[in-house]
From Swiss-Prot:
Residues 147-156, 214-226 have a biased composition (Low complexity). This is N-acetylmuramoyl-L-alanine amidase domain-containing protein SAOUHSC_02979. It comes from Staphylococcus aureus (strain NCTC 8325 / PS 47). InterPro entries: CHAP_dom, Glycosyl_Hydrolase_73, MGlyc_endo_b_GlcNAc-like_dom, Papain-like_cys_pep_sf. NCBIfam families: PRK08581.1-1, PRK08581.1-2. Residues 176-192 have a biased composition (Polar residues).
């Protein structure tokens, strides 16, 4: 049996044909029928050789015609069968006679890996699986159109090649004599000659278009992904879209409201137009009764280097402790009823009213928290200090006037709970249910309640120093046990004595450098006149009043800076208190309002600069 028939036999009997056709042999078939047919066939061959030759020649012609006809029209592939060389019941002869010779040659292609024939190679060649196996996997939607177009292009080129080969075979058959026995071999080789070239030419174009096809496929995938996402959002996320839209609308509305809202606790544009530098004395239009006082703080000096240690402390006062006791019960009840920190409320009252000693806090105003505006139509104007960083300025503003301190406490809680016009939740982050601790509450107040950059730091220091967190507990503390002694210091000691306000009658504006030196000198048993005016006038006016004035540093004396001298104010000048004179001629001074509103700080002046300053010895 020829090699081609063996290959087809292997394929047909082991893989493909047994599932498509009925069996060709049975166990109970009589053996004699087969023997008779074989004997008859052999007898016919031995008796008539010439007939066999003629028949063979005719068979070759018919095979050539069949091959040509099959290549022109695949629908006629199985139409013509030669009865003398093929039996109708022999499926092997049936396939072999009607399979184009070009496909037979393809079946013999050697495996490029093993350099021999394999069953996989035969199957691949039989079904024209000449490309990578991944090409026959299920394509993605985005790639389907691209793969189909490439396949159609390949099939079109292949059909053109087969047509050209068929026409070439037909022309060669017409030229060659029929008696030539090499004609079948020629017809087998002829179609193979152009194939190594033609398929390569046809495959070159798709290869050059791979990048374009991949880009197109990528765009299609992206477009389909976007469309799928939009479809999912449309179908399942209408509520989410609506929520997002409402949130964006509300956020925009809140932003517009906040931008258009004027916080009465902060200076208005009109008030800022009339701001001025803080006055250092009660001269001209600045009166004591119209000036608002606040609490004081002090930084501890480091004894070793005579400079600030950086620690921020409260100036302790017995008056402050008595003030805490006077408002503690009301503050505790209001805090429990309104979800706010009583500790923060009391600390703000201490800071804003100077523990109830400010003229704004006293009768008939009773404003403990420095709340601006009007209460039931009642307000009172006051000069007050505001801060822009560490730079202070003075403005005149209207403050609410209350009939009693209880109304002041209640109005404060209403402000914290209900906010201001246009922004009802401005102080919501200070509530106990919103803030994790009182420090979170004071941090928010520093941005929305006051201009002082140290506002939160001051409140936290007051709460810690006076142990105010106990008033945040559900149970009211025992006020009889709320007592803490104030340390007594030896005036002759080298230790720095904490500042205390010792005079009720104050001739200088509260918190100013002049006010501080006036109190500090009295704390050490000396005094100075209360009518010396602004700081840069002190040395001249003191000398006129028979005070000892010189350029020699002296401990516990007042030191005067002329206007603009060593960083002093260009208009008012500056005055400080000499805490210590060092052996090298340098001096350590304490002063107020240099590092912020109501802050008492310390610094060292070198010997050369110290000799240029004026010193006033108290009486």
């Amino acid at each position: 049996m020829p090699k081609n028939k063996i290959l087809i036999y292997l394929l047909s009997t082991t893989l493909v044909l047994p599932t498509l056709v009925s069996p060709t042999a049975y166990a109970d078939t009589p053996q004699k029928d087969t023997t008779a047919k074989t004997t008859s066939h052999d007898s016919k061959k031995s008796n008539d050789d010439e007939t066999s030759k003629d028949t063979t020649s005719k068979d070759i012609d018919k095979a050539d015609k069949n091959n040509t006809s099959n290549q022109d029209n695949n629908d006629k592939k199985f139409k013509t069968i030669d009865d003398s060389t093929s039996d109708s019941n022999n499926i092997i002869d049936f396939i072999y006679k009607n399979l184009p010779q070009t496909n037979i040659n393809q079946l013999l292609t050697k495996n490029k890996y093993d350099d021999n024939y394999s069953l996989t190679t035969l199957i691949q060649n039989l079904f024209n699986l000449n490309s990578d196996i991944s090409d026959y996997e299920q394509p993605r939607n985005g790639e389907k159109s691209t793969n189909d177009s490439n396949k159609n292009s390949d099939n079109s080129i292949k059909n053109d090649t087969d047509t050209q080969s068929s026409k070439q075979d037909k022309a060669d058959n017409q030229k060659a004599p029929k008696s030539n026995n090499t004609k079948p071999s020629t017809s087998n080789k002829q179609p193979n000659s152009p194939k190594p070239t033609q398929p390569n030419q046809s495959n070159s174009q798709p290869a050059s278009d791979d990048k374009a096809n991949q880009k197109s496929s990528s765009k299609d995938n992206q477009s389909m992904s976007d469309s799928a996402l939009d479809s999912i959002l449309d179908q399942y996320s209408e509520d989410a879209k609506k929520t997002q839209k409402d949130y964006a609308s509300q956020s925009k509305k809140d932003k517009n409201e906040k931008s258009n809202t004027k916080n009465p606790q902060l200076p208005t544009q009109d008030e800022l137009k009339h701001k001025s530098k803080p006055a250092q004395s009660f001269n001209n239009d600045v009166n004591q009764k119209d000036t608002r006082a606040t609490s004081l703080f002090e930084t501890d000096p480091s004894i070793s280097n005579n400079d600030d240690s950086g620690q921020f402390n409260v100036v302790d006062s017995k008056d402050t402790r008595q003030f805490v006791k006077s408002i503690a019960k009301d503050a505790h009840r209001i805090g429990q009823d309104n979800d706010i920190y009583a500790s923060v409320m009391i600390a703000q009252a201490i800071l804003e009213s100077d523990s109830g000693r400010s003229a704004l806090a006293k009768s008939p105003n009773h404003n403990l928290f420095g709340i601006k505006g009007a209460f039931e139509g009642n307000s009172v104007p006051f000069n007050t200090l505001e801060a822009d960083g560490n730079q202070l300025y003075s403005i005149n503003a209207g403050f609410r006037k209350y009939p009693s301190t209880k109304e002041s406490l209640k109005d404060y809680s209403d402000l914290i709970k209900n906010g201001i016009d246009g922004n009802r939740t401005i102080y919501k982050p200070t509530w106990k249910s919103e803030a994790d601790s009182y420090k979170d509450a004071t941090s928010h107040l520093s941005k929305t309640y006051a201009t002082d950059p140290n506002y939160a730091k001051k409140l936290n220091s007051i709460i810690k120093h006076y142990q105010l967190t106990q008033f945040d507990d559900e149970r009211m503390p025992d006020l009889d046990k709320y007592e803490r002694s104030i340390k007594d210091y030896d005036d002759s000691s080298d230790e720095f004595k904490p500042f205390r306000e010792v005079s009720d009658s104050m001739p200088y504006p509260h918190g100013q450098c002049t006010w501080y030196v006036y109190n500090r000198m009295k704390q050490f048993g000396t005094s100075i006149s209360g009518d010396l005016g602004d700081a840069h006038n002190w040395n001249n006016r003191a000398q006129y009043r028979d005070y000892q004035v010189s350029h020699t540093p002296k401990r516990h004396a007042a030191v005067v800076f002329e206007a603009g001298q060593f960083g002093a104010d260009q208009h008012y000048g500056h005055v400080a208190f000499v805490e210590k004179v060092n052996s090298d001629g340098s001096i350590v001074i304490s002063e107020s309002n240099v590092k912020g509103l109501g802050i008492i700080s310390h610094r060292t002046i070198n010997a050369a600069a110290a000799e240029e300053l004026s010193y006033i010895t108290g009486k």
